[in-house]
Amino acid sequence: MAFNRRSKNITQGISRSPNRSMYYAMGYEKEDFDKPMVGVANGHSTITPCNSGLQKLADIAIKTIKDSGGNPQVFGTPTISDGMSMGTEGMKYSLISREVIADCIETAVNGQWMDGVLVIGGCDKNMPGGMIAMLRTNVPSIYVYGGTIKPGNWKGKDLTIVSAFEAVGEFTAGRMSQEDFDGIERNACPSAGSCGGMYTANTMSSSFEALGLALPYSSTMANPDDEKVGSAAESARVLIEAIKNDLKPRDIVTRKAIENAVAVIMATGGSTNAVLHFLAIAHAAEVEWTIDDFERMRKKVPVICDLKPSGKYVATDLHKAGGIPQVMKVLLDAGLLHGDCMTITGQTVAEALAHIPSVPRADQHVIHPIKDALYEQGHLAILKGNLSPEGCVAKITGLKNPVITGPARVFDDEYSAMDAIMANKIVAGDVLVMRYLGPKGGPGMPEMLAPTSALVGQGLGESVGLITDGRFSGGTWGMVVGHVSPEAFVGGLIGLVEEGDSVTIDAHKLLIQLNVPEEEIARRRANWKQPAPRYTRGVLSKFAALASSASKGAVTG
């Protein structure tokens, strides 16, 4: 049986002789035209440590595809460093890069009639961008995560990149010495790999393992370790088998599979960005999934992993404790996973977990049994109210002050808010309102890690509320609410909040409310005018014109 189901369209027949001439120029032989053409979407880049260790994974995948009877076709995908662009205009390109990556992969795979694709990525938006493309093209596919960074260390304390962001606030508040500030800066990132807590990259990689389109254990391996190369090779072998069996992403990514992925996100205390990205992934898979489904899942899935940013441990600790397979086995035995879902290996979830012990090892403290869950319900809550009738996202577990009502401190951009924080003009009890930062208004929903980390560093992380129509980094924690929809730019109520207004965030009631009389709101709405777009050309302008509401995943098509 021939497995070049798609590529035969450009390699077979008399009329394709010129095509074969071009392949011969790249070292192909006649017998290669009967083999499947397998894309390798290589996200290697020296822009960021998240992607700087990917080439070795691409190299072994290329070799393994060839040794397994395929023709590897390598092409590059771009990346943005969320950490480096944070707090600058560059952060506006972060979410947009999700769409750009998806478009790049879709264009190469479909333009060249590839029979399958192996996607390699590292930084945050590489994951959803690659997955969206895999689902759009619906050719046999597998995701290879570049791996997590190892924890840094300073004076015996483990560090992540968030340690460096929080140090900015501590240092400027006079709560940290120059020696410690410099020491954290120099030692926070000791290797290649993505940011080490259960931040966005590790959240998405873990969810892909649960979804069934990445290999078991692959999502928590560290990039520098040899097992990461071995996993990339095995991924290539598994992909060739999937091509032979015509096992495609949409055969795997069903509504039940997405429930499995979201269950793991809740159980591990994952990033708020997962809400946005899984809305987009479901859209690409043509699976019915809404923002309210996250709240449904939150109510039944406990948090069983003690992971940063709000917990103690990092992804490498999770790996040593048994990784995502151990988390999934605990959830499966509790009736919180669908064991009959298919995975890219050809096994069901239940079959893949059959050899995993039901109870986590006693010599680790990262993964808890259900009876000893850290929190009885999940952490990613969907809040609604007059400020966000479509829904917005907050992490609500572990909050010392789950309810706050305070005066609004209103900022129409991130920079003025950051200036106010650094000048010590924000005090306990305030509610920061950062707006015109949504999909269309930002544009691109920039992340607010710099201001939230500065507040934490100043000791205000538990006593100040923050709401925005932008996003938060996976490293953010505290009384913060993002993805407020509808956004200010399209007339959402967040755009009508005035300095000093009373605003309530209530994690118990899942409420976000502007405490202003309806008559006053109506008066303000009558006087509101949509501002001019911040960009009128280029990719930012394109995204602003096409992006849907954050409550729909900020998808562009």
UniProtKB/Swiss-Prot annotation:
Cofactor notes: Binds 1 [2Fe-2S] cluster per subunit. This cluster acts as a Lewis acid cofactor.
Modification sites for N6-carboxylysine: 125
Binding, [2Fe-2S] cluster:
50, 123, 195
* Residues that hold Mg(2+) according to the record: 82, 124-125, 447
According to UniProt, the reaction catalysed is: (2R)-2,3-dihydroxy-3-methylbutanoate = 3-methyl-2-oxobutanoate + H2O; (2R,3R)-2,3-dihydroxy-3-methylpentanoate = (S)-3-methyl-2-oxopentanoate + H2O
What's the EC number here? 4.2.1.9
**What Pfam families does this protein map onto?**
ILV_EDD_C, ILVD_EDD_N
Give the pathway annotation.
Amino-acid biosynthesis; L-isoleucine biosynthesis; L-isoleucine from 2-oxobutanoate: step 3/4; Amino-acid biosynthesis; L-valine biosynthesis; L-valine from pyruvate: step 3/4
Catalytic residues identified in the record = 473 (proton acceptor)
Matches recorded under Gene3D superfamilies? IlvD/EDD C-terminal domain-like
Q: Name one GO biological process term.
A: isoleucine biosynthetic process
Reported cofactor(s): [2Fe-2S] cluster; Mg(2+)
**Which keywords belong to this entry?**
2Fe-2S, Amino-acid biosynthesis, Branched-chain amino acid biosynthesis, Iron, Iron-sulfur, Lyase, Magnesium, Metal-binding
* InterPro entries linked to this entry: DHAD_IlvD/Edd, Dihydro-acid_dehy_C, DihydroxyA_deHydtase, DiOHA_6PGluconate_deHydtase_CS, ILV_EDD_C, ILV_EDD_N, IlvD/EDD_N
Classify the source by domain of life: Bacteria
User: Recorded GO terms, molecular function?
Assistant: 2 iron, 2 sulfur cluster binding; dihydroxy-acid dehydratase activity; magnesium ion binding
Quote the subunit structure annotation.
Homodimer.
Family from the record: Belongs to the IlvD/Edd family.
Q: What is this protein called?
A: Dihydroxy-acid dehydratase
Look up and give the organism this protein is from. Answer: Janthinobacterium sp. (strain Marseille)
Q: What is the lineage of its organism?
A: Bacteria, Pseudomonadati, Pseudomonadota, Betaproteobacteria, Burkholderiales
